[in-house]
Amino acid sequence: MRIGIFTRLGADSIMRFFCTREKKTLSNNLSPIGGPAVNTLIVGFLAKGHFVRVFTPATNDFYVKGDGVEVVGLKNNDNYLVKYTVGCFVDAFRMKRAIENKIHDLDVLHAHWSYEGAWAAGQYAHIKPVFCTIRDWAPLIWKFESAKNKITWSFRVLLNELVLRQKKVEFVANSPYTANLAKRKLKKEVPMIPNPISPSFLKSDSHVNPLIFTVLCISSSNDKRKNIPTLLKGFQFFFKKNNNARLQIIGEPFTLDNECCKAWEAQGLLKSVELLGLQKHDDLKCFLDNCSVFITPSLEETFGNTLIEAFARRVPVIGGEKSGAVPYVLGQGEFGYLCDVSDAQSVAAALYEVYSNPSESLLIAEKAYMNVETRYVSNRICDEHIELYNKAIGSYEN
């Protein structure tokens, strides 16, 4: 099958399919990580012999061709005022024009996230099947954002609304939580296909806890929804009673020169905390293998890809009991520990639960690993997508 994917592509994930010159173009114009779940899906399609053409935001316009895959980079508007106001609309219209002559040889178009790529792809839903996987819920994100960021997100909420009104686009949810939100909005059932994980992420041997009780958090941002300050406070409560412990936080904002991090340090919230900044996605395996527990303090997630990555490395996991799709991924507590992540004392209590019951926590982690192995491995998730595509193609042909 010939598949068009709209996503923010991570360069590192597909380097193996390109020659040296093309690799340089990719590394110069794309972020190294992008969206790991969609990266994994793309690689899974390629492994099964499908052709994939990826349309992605980039530093500059470019086109590269590799082994069974092509990447079309589309430069975003970088004017400051435009970028943080109507930029999403400008980019959507530009993408629509740019892809016009690059989609006719494709069997299906699939946009991930319901913004620029989804709107652009949706303009061609009258000639071929177009799918959109809803990977966040824009109105809810708007509520969490600061007053300044609400300006930007007001435009994104409007664009998301226009995408969801496209009658010919077939929507997909990445969790029952997202599917329920979409059902209420669209007044119809929406199929659910969860995020995939690469088989290479699965750890074959058992997890061994480090000598120092190590708490690991991976977060792509430092906004209110990600709730990092509550984690820091909860860890400090835990650390006062169990000083053989450390907290490691991975993600681009988490460096000592970041203004928020400086403020946390001044408040005494960084005692025994290591800010590790952005790390290569493949290197996360090493950090997971050397931690005692993984925690996501997010107040809301439509899935939470880092949760299944921790499962895949056989690591105990803590997440929020009311945090969107997190309880679903954690099997309502069967595959991990649920707590009130909005309360620092509850976070500390969950950390203590794992700390004081290492054997039990590793048994729960083993159950989580088995669940990942049977439900989330990319081979299965790719097949579920292809089945969905084939049904849509058949209806268009008929």
Regions found by a protein language model. Give the residues of each.
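Aromatic "clamp/platform" in nucleotide-sugar-dependent glycosyltransferases that forms part
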Residues: 299
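Glycosyltransferase donor-sugar binding loop
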Residues: 218-219, 246-261, 277
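Membrane-proximal helix-turn-helix segments that form the acceptor-binding/catalytic region
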Residues: 39-41, 138, 151-171
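Carbohydrate-associated surface elements
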Residues: 177, 196
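Short hydrophobic beta-strand element within catalytic cores of glycosyltransferases
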Residues: 316-320
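Conserved donor-binding/catalytic core segment of Leloir-type glycosyltransferases
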Residues: 207-226, 232-236, 248
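Conserved acidic donor-binding segment of nucleotide-sugar-dependent glycosyltransferases
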Residues: 332-344, 353-358
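Nucleotide-activated donor-binding/catalytic signature segment of Leloir-type glycosyltransferases, i.e.
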Residues: 260-279
